[in-house]
């Protein structure tokens, strides 16, 4: 249920008002990230989530709640409460592994997701690329970065091959291997977009694995694999710029050195793939 309030509340207030019988599970963090934590009562478990990006507009967090409200429980956690800076969703039991599942199994999950009704809002990358440029450390902004940004702005985003609801953050840490099959968590970037964009954004280990995933998906979607792979490749420069910009943005936001290393590595990949 959505609960509208302009006044943020504390964690203790949230629990006492809405979940008075639940208590935090302090020793459990499998599959949790950011400010998330687990609460439990008589074997029933919920995940209490906060926005990963404290500077993001509240509307982005609300969209995540709406996306989860639309999705079937077979692929995503069901939400139970939304209010400013807080969301409570089902805990998904299962294993979160350090590597991707079999490509055919993952292709099946993504194809099933892409058959669901659209969310109602489009994923557009250019505004994000420009935001990350503007919000990055001025000392890190380079002529090459600006040149690539202008090039993409002029080229415009590839025309969608098929428009569907997307997760847009598919990696091993966001996949729960449950008894009933694969499920996805962390839907903060979800929206409608090109299915090839989703496939391009999967955090794969190598090109061979990526090609196999695309081939397995193409078989299910009845698309020529070569055609789908060409469309996936069209998105590569956009996604690498998105990743690099996000790492730069997070570096300025947090001061965490890991983001500088990740940004530098992504810039190198972008130069290789040009």
From Swiss-Prot:
Enzyme kind, highest EC tier: transferase
Report the InterPro entries cross-referenced here. Answer: Aminoglycoside_PTrfase, Kinase-like_dom_sf, Thiamine_kinase
Swiss-Prot/TrEMBL catalytic activity: thiamine + ATP = thiamine phosphate + ADP + H(+)
Q: Name one GO biological process term.
A: thiamine metabolic process
Fetch the Pfam families from UniProt.
APH
**Metabolic or biological pathway, per its Swiss-Prot or TrEMBL entry:** Cofactor biosynthesis; thiamine diphosphate biosynthesis; thiamine phosphate from thiamine: step 1/1
| Keywords annotated in UniProt | ATP-binding, Kinase, Nucleotide-binding, Transferase
Which NCBIfam families does this entry report, sorted A to Z?
Answer: PRK10271.1, ycfN_thiK
Family membership noted in the UniProt record? Belongs to the thiamine kinase family.
Role description: Catalyzes the ATP-dependent phosphorylation of thiamine to thiamine phosphate. Is involved in thiamine salvage.
Q: What is this protein called?
A: Thiamine kinase
Supply the source organism for this entry.
Shigella boydii serotype 4 (strain Sb227)
């Amino acid at each position: 249920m959505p609960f509208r309030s302009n006044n943020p509340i504390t964690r203790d207030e949230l629990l006492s008002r809405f979940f008075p019988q639940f208590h935090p599970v302090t020793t459990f963090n499998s599959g949790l990230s950011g400010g998330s934590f687990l609460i439990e009562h008589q074997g029933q478990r919920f995940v209490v989530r906060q926005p990963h990006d404290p500077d993001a507009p509240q509307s982005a967090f609300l969209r995540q709640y709406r996306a989860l409200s639309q999705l079937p429980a077979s692929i995503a956690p069901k939400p139970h409460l939304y209010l400013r800076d807080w969301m409570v969703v089902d805990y998904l039991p299962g294993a979160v592994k350090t590597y991707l599942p079999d490509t055919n199994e993952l292709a099946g999950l993504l194809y099933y997701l892409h058959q669901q009704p659209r969310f109602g809002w489009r994923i557009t990358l250019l505004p994000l690329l420009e935001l990350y440029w503007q919000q990055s450390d001025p000392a890190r902004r380079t002529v090459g970065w600006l040149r690539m940004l202008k090039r993409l702005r002029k080229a415009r985003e590839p025309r969608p091959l098929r428009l569907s609801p997307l997760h847009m953050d598919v990696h091993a840490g966001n996949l729960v291997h449950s008894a009933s099959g694969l499920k996805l968590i962390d839907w903060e970037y979800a929206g409608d977009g090109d299915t090839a964009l989703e496939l391009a954004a999967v955090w794969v280990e190598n090109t061979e694995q990526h090609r196999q995933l695309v081939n397995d998906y193409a078989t299910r979607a009845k698309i020529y694999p070569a055609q789908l792979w060409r469309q996936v490749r069209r998105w590569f420069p956009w996604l690498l710029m998105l990743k690099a910009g996000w790492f730069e943005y997070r570096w300025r936001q947090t001061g965490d050195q890991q983001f500088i290393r990740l940004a530098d590595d992504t810039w190198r990949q972008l130069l290789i793939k040009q």
